[in-house]
Structure formats: C-alpha cells, structure tokens
C-alpha cells in the first residue's frame, strides 16, 4: 500500500470512529425532539453511559479473574443502554408528568454528570479522573487494515432504519403527531404522554449506547469529561 493510500485509509477510519458516537447520540436526540420534548441532557447521558459500561466490565473482570471473556463488553453495552434509558426516563418524568421546565431538568442532569462520575471513580479506584483499563473491550470487525467496532456499523445502519421507523410506520406517525400537534393526536386517541415517554427513553438508550462505544469501544477505560461536548454537538 502506498503512503497516500495508507494515509487516506487511516483518515477514513478515524472519521468513521469519531462519527459513530455523534451519530448515535443525534439519532437518539431526534426521537425525543420528534415527540415534543427538548432533551439537552444528551451530554450527561453520554457520560453516564460511558461510565456505566467501563465500570461494569472492569468490575466483572475483577470478579471473574483473568482470561478472555468475549461476552463481557456486551454486558457493559446493555448496562449502558439501560442506565441511559433510566436517566432519560427521569428527565421525561419530571418534564411530562410534573411539567417542570425541560431545559432546567436537562441542565440538572448535565450538572449531575459532571460530579457523579468523580464520586464513582473515587469509590472504586481511588482517583477522580479515570477508571482502570478493561481487558475485554468491544471486538473489531472487518478486513485487515480496515477494522471497526461493531457499534460503528450499527450507528450507520441505524440511519436508514430510523428514517423508516419515523416516516414509514404507524409508530413514527404517532410520535411525530404528538410532537407537532399533540391536541390533534389526543383527539384521535393517541396517548400523548406515553408516546413522549417512549421518545425520550429511546433517546437515552441510543445515547447510552454511544457512551458505551466511547469507553469500551473507542478507548478501553472511562476518563472524566471524555464526551468532550459531543452531546451538545449532536443536538
């Protein structure tokens, strides 16, 4: 391979790897926005997802002992998605049921995500900046010289799938209806509150997935502030 080809390949790989978490977070945010709930808590959810994935995998490695455990990173991914969905549910609950200001609720989550990881890291690792490195990170798929995390492929495959769900399915029609014309949707029998809960929780699940990619796919540990504003960029 020539020097120019090697450079272009490395540039393309780097671009795809950096794009994946932004894409997952942006797709998640779109579900929330389409349902009529502003979710600027994506940055905080991204950090909570990354922290959860790294800590869960590292703690399980410590409990199970040395040796390859190829299924462990997928447990971390599921845990990150669950925590992301849970944090988003809290935002939805406060915003929808208790009618709190959506911006204030989301800002509170972002502020919590600035401090909570330090407490968790200090408790488990004795420092407030990073977790231990995990031995079982997400695998790489693809031909030699062009290998990517499976979550990169997932991120790009979700683009057409999300379009299809939002614009070609009854679920997508209802979700868009409650965001654009909630009164009209309600008169047609659509449960506006339930659809909004679903939209916000989906945004949290996808953003948690992006966080898992950052800590056990792109890197192999959690580092405080590793999202570097990606949640806000994705908005």
Regions found by a protein language model. Give the residues of each.
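Membrane-interfacial amphipathic/re-entrant helices at transmembrane-helix boundaries
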Residues: 1-25, 38, 52, 60-75
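Hydrophobic alpha-helical transmembrane segments
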Residues: 12-15, 23, 44, 48, ...
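Hydrophobic alpha-helical segments embedded in the membrane of multi-pass proteins
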Residues: 19-28, 44-49, 86-89, 208-210, ...
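Short, non-helical or kinked segments that cap or interrupt transmembrane helices
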Residues: 33-49, 96-109, 198, 219-233
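Alpha-helical transmembrane segments within multi-pass membrane transporters and channels
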Residues: 66-114, 157-160
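Mid-bilayer segments of alpha-helical transmembrane spans in multi-pass integral membrane proteins
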Residues: 89, 111-124, 150, 161, ...
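Extracellular/periplasmic helix-loop junction at the C-terminal end of a transmembrane helix
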Residues: 114-144
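Helix-loop-helix "hairpin" substructures at the membrane interface of multi-pass membrane proteins
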Residues: 146-222
């Amino acid at each position: 391979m020539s020097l120019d080809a090697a450079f272009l390949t490395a540039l393309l790989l780097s671009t795809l790897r950096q794009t994946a978490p932004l894409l997952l977070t942006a797709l998640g945010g779109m579900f929330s926005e389409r349902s009529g709930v502003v979710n600027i808590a994506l940055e905080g959810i991204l950090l909570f997802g990354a922290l959860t994935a790294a800590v869960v995998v590292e703690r399980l490695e410590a409990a199970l002992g040395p040796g390859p455990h190829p299924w462990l990173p997928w447990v971390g991914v599921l845990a990150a998605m669950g925590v992301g969905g849970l944090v988003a549910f809290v935002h939805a609950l406060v915003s929808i049921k208790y009618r709190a200001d959506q911006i204030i609720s989301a800002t509170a989550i972002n502020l919590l995500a600035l401090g909570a990881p330090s407490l968790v890291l200090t408790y488990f690792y004795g420092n407030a900046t990073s977790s231990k490195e995990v031995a079982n990170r997400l695998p790489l798929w693809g031909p030699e010289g062009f290998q990517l995390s499976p979550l990169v492929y997932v991120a790009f495959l979700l683009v057409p799938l999300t379009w299809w769900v939002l614009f070609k399915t009854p679920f997508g029609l209802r979700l868009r209806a409650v965001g654009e014309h909630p009164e009209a949707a309600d008169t047609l029998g659509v449960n506006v509150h339930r659809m909004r809960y679903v939209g916000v929780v989906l945004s949290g699940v996808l953003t948690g997935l992006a966080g898992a990619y950052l800590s056990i796919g792109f890197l192999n540990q959690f580092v405080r502030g590793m999202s570097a504003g990606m949640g806000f960029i994705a908005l």
